[in-house]
Design a protein with these regions (language model features):
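ASCE RecA-like P-loop NTPase motor cores
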Residues: 1-183
Length: 183
């Protein structure tokens, strides 16, 4: 999406040099890119322009590290206004006590990881804490993902076994995510 700000950024000769250098740097394990000294609006326009102009070379989502989660949310909203698909990979909530805890954050994290595997994002925003944390390997996530189609018959005992193996809890009445019931 071209805006006045991204058009001005793209017209700058220094942006052209940065874009060429960035495109040359894409490889199996690309190095991070840091841009500093820009005011907030210019930094946003630079980021949007780079994300749009390197989409083909990236071959996947860009990882954007923000200092805090509130910055991820703010930047994610901005990128979405420019038409970019973003995911927010939040830090894991650690529970040190044996207590019932909401797994809502875990569900959101798995949703982003699944979206990454499916190519649903142009960029994933996260904090250093979240990026450095352990998570499920892609092959295990793919293996444990169950796709249910309304027009296909289900083997209910096999489905229950797979859901239980993936960490879901069988209950009589579902009242929160992570639970399932058979009728």
């Amino acid at each position: 999406m071209n805006s006045i700000l991204t058009s001005v950024i793209r017209a700058d000769p220094e942006y052209g040099q940065l874009l060429r250098a960035t495109k040359q740097d894409f490889r199996a394990n690309p190095l991070p890119i840091l841009a500093s000294g820009l005011c907030e609006g210019a930094a946003d326009a630079l980021l949007v322009s780079l994300l749009e102009d390197t989409e083909r070379e990236r071959g996947g989502a860009a990882l954007i590290l923000c200092p805090e989660e509130k910055d991820c949310v703010k930047l994610g909203g901005l990128l979405e206004r420019f038409g970019l698909r973003t995911g927010f990979y939040m830090a894991r909530d650690l529970t040190f006590y044996n207590m019932t805890a909401s797994h809502e954050y875990e569900h959101e994290r798995i949703k982003v990881l699944s979206g990454l595997m499916a190519g649903e994002y142009d960029a994933v925003l996260t904090t250093p804490d979240a990026a450095l944390g352990y998570t499920v390997p892609p092959e295990i996530l793919k293996k444990t993902t169950v796709v249910i189609n309304a027009d296909e018959p289900l083997d209910l005992p096999e489905l229950a076994k797979r859901l239980t193996g993936a960490g879901f809890v069988r209950v009589d009445l579902v009242d929160s995510p992570g639970q399932f019931a058979l009728r």
